[in-house]
Each structure stands twice: as structure tokens, then as C-alpha cells.
Amino acid sequence: MGLLRKRGDRVDRRRASSWALANPAEYALIFGSPVPGYTAPPDTLPAATRTPRALLQILIDGVRSGALSDTGPAGLPDDVRADFTRIREEHLPDLPEALMARGFLGRTHLFGAVSFEVFGQFDEVVEARDAYFDFQMRQVAELVGL
């Protein structure tokens, strides 16, 4: 979490979670079960990619500032490496493979945690949800290298 503290911005670090809890139906439309045969209109793409882009930008900023470095190969299976190579070439040329892989892992954990809370998976299990969410995100930040 050192890099996040150094960034100096005071954004609400629970923004994705807070929005999802306040707007569960909208969250479900974006991140819930797909509707067979439905393709979202192109104008919805910016909203759907806002959080992933912000997460990746934190990693890119960390690389550019020298606070994050490539830790070598990500250990990706070859077919996944091909996917990530394509994504990096098209959208994220400044992000080393290992950091990109960890960033995607962080995104998966973030939305998994939010989805568990929004869809009631913690009901009658975890009462201190804010504290648990913060704990999860600290663990994910460490895993990602932040």
C-alpha cells in the first residue's frame, strides 16, 4: 500500500464498493450474470471500464515513477501470455507483463469481493464488512505490489 499512500490523492478507496452497494441493480447489469443474446451499447463501455482503467493507471504511474518494477516473467501459461501480449501491444505498452498479470488479478479480487457483498454472500457470515473489505484490499494491494 506504500505506492497508494505516496500518490497523495484522497479518492474514496471504497468507491467501487460504495457505488455497487448503493446501486445493486446497475452493478448487476454491468458485473452480474450475462443476458443471453444481449450486447451492451458501445456508449456504455467508458462507464464499464472506469474502475479497471483507474487500477491499471495506478500501476502505470508506479512504473513511470520507479516505485514499481517488473519482477520478471509472470509465469503465465503460453496461451494466456499471448492474450496479455495482445492487450499490452494494443492498450498498455508501458506496463510490464508481470505487473499487468498482477493488475488483472487485483481487478478480479476487487470485483469478487464487491460481488460477494452486493449479492449477499457475506450475510450472516461477516458482520464487520467495511473492515473485512479493507483487509481484503490491503492483501490484494500487497499481492499486486502496491
Residue ranges and their predicted role:
Residues 1-26, 36, 45-52:
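Hydrophobic alpha-helical connector segments
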Residues 13-16, 30, 106, 110:
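Short alpha-helical scaffolding segments that buttress acidic/His motifs in well-ordered protein cores
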Residues 28-30, 118:
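Short amphipathic alpha-helical segments with coiled-coil-like heptad repeat character
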Residues 31-38:
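Short linear capping/connector segments at secondary-structure termini
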Residues 41-42:
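Divalent-cation-assisted or electrostatically stabilized phosphate/pyrophosphate-binding catalytic cores
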Residues 53-146:
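C-terminal peripheral helix-coil segments that are non-catalytic and often amphipathic
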